[in-house]
Amino acid sequence: MPTESIDTIDALKKEQVYNDALMAKYLTFYTDNLLFGVNASYVVEIIINHALTSLPMTPDYVKGIINLRGQIIPIIDIRLRIGRPDAETDSTVCIIVLDIEGTQIGILVDRVAQMVDIDESQLSVSLVSDQQLVSGMISLEDGGNTMLVLDCARMISEV
């Protein structure tokens, strides 16, 4: 086999490894008709129909806590956190439990959509006014929906 072909194959393999390193899975969800995504590496589980215990003297967006197998987890309502009006809960509302740098937190969302593969090199800087929660955005290939990327590290620093 000529050396030129081997070099080409090696270059293609390196490019594939580089491209794979930039790809990440994201769990997408809707809140107030906005599509958000969170890196799947943070996701512990998705909970439906779990009772919340409210807490006094907390911001409105902290809906309360849950006891999940003996662990107390604070729950943040993303809708309220981004300044949207509160909504009635229905059967599609669920809690996504996240583990961010060893801290578990739950986010209350309108509905979970799907898992998508994202090329993180294609993420653009967020133009959203409340950048405390959004670190970037990307146009998805499934019809042009724009996904806002949730900045988990910033979110837990405020709880």
Labelled PLM ranges:
Residues 1-159:
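An acidic, low-aromatic, low-complexity terminal/linker signal
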